[in-house]
Regions:
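Conserved phosphotransfer microenvironments
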Residues: 69-88
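C-terminal output helix
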Residues: 125-134
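Short hydrophobic/Thr-rich beta-strand motif most characteristic of the beta2 strand and flanking loop
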Residues: 43-51, 58
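The C-terminal output helix
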Residues: 135-140
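His-Asp phosphorelay/catalytic-motif detector in bacterial-type signaling
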Residues: 90-98
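Conserved acidic segment of CheY-like receiver
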Residues: 19-30, 35-39
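Conserved sequence signature across two-component system core domains
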Residues: 25-26, 49, 67, 102
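Alpha4 helix (beta4-alpha4-beta5 surface) of REC/receiver domains from two-component response regulators
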Residues: 80, 101-121
């Protein structure tokens, strides 16, 4: 077991007591690490999930302010999670959680638009890119 991780693969990095919780759903450690490096501001508490199925359940429990999802995550995919959240939000606007999608190619931006995400960033991304996308998503 890695330091800071429990058996379920979740890691909590609390950066401030009154921080906005950002959920990061990615099965690749480098993607989660890059998002963490970009969001080291004291304004954010980051919650990681490497399994999209357990992450979907945790969204209701954790109620994050925003979610960052890798497009290619496990066998489910970030698109399916984003679509599920978007459809749920259409039924109950109060439950809408903005999503930032991490894309593999710029050409995938049409997928992000179709999923109804608040913002997207194409890999490889800079810290500035991901910070700007998350701030944009939180402002919606």
């Amino acid at each position: 077991m890695l330091p800071g991780f429990d058996i379920g693969g979740r890691q909590r990095a609390t950066l401030a007591a009154m921080a906005s919780t950002i959920m990061v759903i990615a099965d690749e450690a480098w993607a989660r690490n890059d998002v963490h490096a970009a969001l080291t501001e004291p304004d954010y508490t980051l919650v990681d999930h490497d399994n999209p199925k357990t992450a979907r359940d945790a969204v209701a429990a954790d109620r994050p302010a925003a979610i960052v999802i890798d497009l290619q995550v496990a066998n489910m995919g970030g698109m399916a999670i984003a679509r599920d959240l978007h459809q749920h939000a259409a039924l109950n606007e109060e439950d809408a959680i903005p999503v930032v999608l991490l894309l593999d190619r710029a050409a995938d931006s049409f997928l992000a638009k179709r999923a109804g995400v608040a913002a997207w960033v194409t890999k490889p991304f800079s810290s500035h890119d991901i910070r700007t996308a998350v701030e944009h998503a939180l402002a919606k």
